Amino acid sequence: MTASPLAQTPNDMFNAPIAEADPEIAEILDAELSRQQNGLEMIASENFVPRAVLQAQGSVLTNKYAEGYPGRRYYGGCEQVDKIETIARERAKSLFGAEYANVQPHSGAQANAAVYQALVKPGDTVLGLALDHGGHLTHGMKINFSGRFYHAEAYGVNPETFRIDPEIIRQRALETHPAMIIGGWSAYPRIEDFKAMKEIADEVGAKFWVDMAHFAGLVAAGLHPSPVPYADVVSSTAHKTLGGPRSGFILAKQEYAKKLNSAVFPGQQGGPLMHVIAGKAVAFKVAATPEFKDRMQRTLDGAKILAERLMADDVKNNGISVLTGGTDVHLVMVDLRNSEMDGKQGEDLLAQCGITINRNTVPFDPRPASVASGLRIGTSALATRGFGPKEYEEVADIIGTALAAGQDVDALKARVDKLAEDFPLYPGLDQIH
């Protein structure tokens, strides 16, 4: 008599590959791999991790609890994870020229929460870039912890240039007397003046914190000014341009080490995710290589090529423009305020072509955030796949043509398919199991 699958012993299930243990989840994982391989990922906050990072995150380190810090754990058996966390911290410090690093934050938002806890008190005034002008939820949005537990004030971009203007920040700082000024952004295409912002913070007696989650990879490659010499504390994610696992980390001057360590653990988190910290260590090593710098240069080149194509007459004639007239970073902000097309429609149109982006609000947006009047388009993931100028010109033309007149979607999709085929992602990995 054949035993029912339900009669399997726990050991059978323990040792079974995912295709046998949970075919439903395995099928979805395979479908997601296919989606990533066969489309073009251009969401500015997304990237592809190296295989070595996938291996680290899928390792036996996922089994280990390690509350505390290396040499000061609250659990036994931490000899190996202590080594890994120490390596990750030292690599982060070396990569960014920082005195201190904490690699335990589970995410960028957790890292940011720890910064608040370490530098300011509940009810203190903080001053950050407005969300609808390119800021982040954790920079003071009212429904976020940062806007609920702190008195959040905002500065916006210059209404004529759409650029962050230090003089506007200074005036807002003089008006609001913040305990902390926040630099960094999630949807802004230019470089901030960290030196000027630090001078403003000093003038009003505020701490200066920069969230470099989006541009950390560019900083690591030496292709973007570093906030580390100017900011009291710098937070970041390890993914986005840096191309590591989805997670966060914090850099700072040594004088803030004790407060930040306590804010991360036990202030915000319990046990760190050691398999993710191993992935961060690998990503930091990769980011220190010439290969990574070349990838970041191609990322910047691709963004400029895209911006130039989207400023062509056929796109302009559809009421579409590029915010600030170009880009200095890995993303382009497309302005649809004068177009009949809204952000949701633009996102859906490009999805039909096989290109994934996201709609985004733009400064002074007349439309609700659910549809928005902007598109945020990033070039990091394509550089990771190996795209160079020729390929960026092709994908830029696909996007420009689609937005200009909604040309034959099937023909545009065929061009996308060819690009994806020519630059395979994780070649040889056809199934998760």
Swiss-Prot record:
GO terms for biological process: glycine biosynthetic process from serine; tetrahydrofolate interconversion. Its cofactor is pyridoxal 5'-phosphate. It catalyses: (6R)-5,10-methylene-5,6,7,8-tetrahydrofolate + glycine + H2O = (6S)-5,6,7,8-tetrahydrofolate + L-serine. Keywords: Amino-acid biosynthesis, Cytoplasm, One-carbon metabolism, Pyridoxal phosphate, Transferase. One of its GO terms (cellular component) is cytosol. Pathway: One-carbon metabolism; tetrahydrofolate interconversion; Amino-acid biosynthesis; glycine biosynthesis; glycine from L-serine: step 1/1. It is found in: Cytoplasm. Catalyzes the reversible interconversion of serine and glycine with tetrahydrofolate (THF) serving as the one-carbon carrier. This reaction serves as the major source of one-carbon groups required for the biosynthesis of purines, thymidylate, methionine, and other important biomolecules. Also exhibits THF-independent aldolase activity toward beta-hydroxyamino acids, producing glycine and aldehydes, via a retro-aldol mechanism. Belongs to the SHMT family. Homodimer. PANTHER family: SERINE HYDROXYMETHYLTRANSFERASE (PTHR11680), SERINE HYDROXYMETHYLTRANSFERASE 1 (PTHR11680:SF35). This is Serine hydroxymethyltransferase. The gene is glyA.
